[in-house]
């Protein structure tokens, strides 16, 4: 089942085409990477997908419905979650209060909201941080809280913008584990864009490589790593991909 389908997305700034007829799909329970060098067009493609940037051409379909012109909040109501690269937690609230603040917008009783908050705290290993103010969390703990908050509305697709940015290696491994669990245990589909190519490919079923505004290649990680054009254009010939063999 295809959840998200981007067809021939185009974006121009002035006389320059930064995204040139990019197409891709995200199926149910798939983790897809959107990768490319700085200035390649991947971030603009990602932002058109989530609704932050309006395309000059092409369409975005979600569950078969055309959402190309819908703002972000309406996409969220349809089941599309989003984790921003910038910190999005309420810094002066505790971890528990951050979850309850988002749960206030759901049609649940107080006891149901507390139960859901407790479940998310346990799922993301944040129970011991329950009373901790968000500003004092580590980068990895903050990322976990942000993902937990994104799950409050029970999205079927989650878009992660630089989830591994500013996070130490051990915390990155924790986040990778959470991403795998979102897919395997909760049935979520995930679209990731990140500059940490190695870590992103480790959790992806497939990835797209964007270059000069176009899809250079797409496929499973091992296939991309062994693609000579991808190595020449993006990964470099010294990129290690032994774990994908």
Task: Give residue ranges: language-model regions.
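Conserved ABC transporter NBD signature motif
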Residues: 58-65, 78, 116
């Amino acid at each position: 089942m295809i959840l998200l389908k981007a067809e021939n997305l185009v974006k121009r700034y002035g006389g320059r085409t930064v995204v040139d007829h990019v197409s891709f799909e995200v199926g149910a329970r798939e983790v897809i990477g959107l990768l490319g060098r700085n200035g390649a067009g991947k971030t603009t493609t990602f932002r058109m997908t989530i609704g932050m940037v309006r395309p000059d051409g092409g369409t975005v379909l979600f569950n078969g419905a055309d959402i190309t012109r819908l703002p972000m909040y309406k996409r969220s109501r349809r089941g599309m979650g989003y984790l921003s690269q910038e910190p999005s937690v309420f810094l002066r609230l505790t971890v528990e209060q951050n979850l309850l603040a988002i749960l206030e917008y759901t049609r649940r009783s107080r006891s149901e909201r507390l139960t859901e908050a407790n479940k998310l705290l346990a799922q993301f290993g944040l129970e011991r941080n329950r009373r901790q103010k968000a500003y004092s969390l580590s980068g990895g703990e903050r990322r976990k809280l942000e993902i937990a908050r994104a799950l409050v509305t029970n999205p079927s697709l989650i878009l992660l913008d630089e989830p591994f940015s500013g996070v130490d290696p051990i915390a990155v491994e924790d986040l990778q584990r959470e991403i795998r669990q979102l897919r395997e245990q909760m049935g979520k589909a995930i679209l990731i864009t990140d500059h940490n190519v190695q870590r992103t490919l480790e959790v992806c079923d497939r990835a797209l490589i964007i270059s000069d505004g176009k899809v250079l290649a797409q496929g499973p990680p091992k296939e991309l790593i062994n693609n000579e054009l991808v190595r020449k254009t993006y990964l470099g010939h010294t990129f290690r991909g032994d774990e994908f063999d």
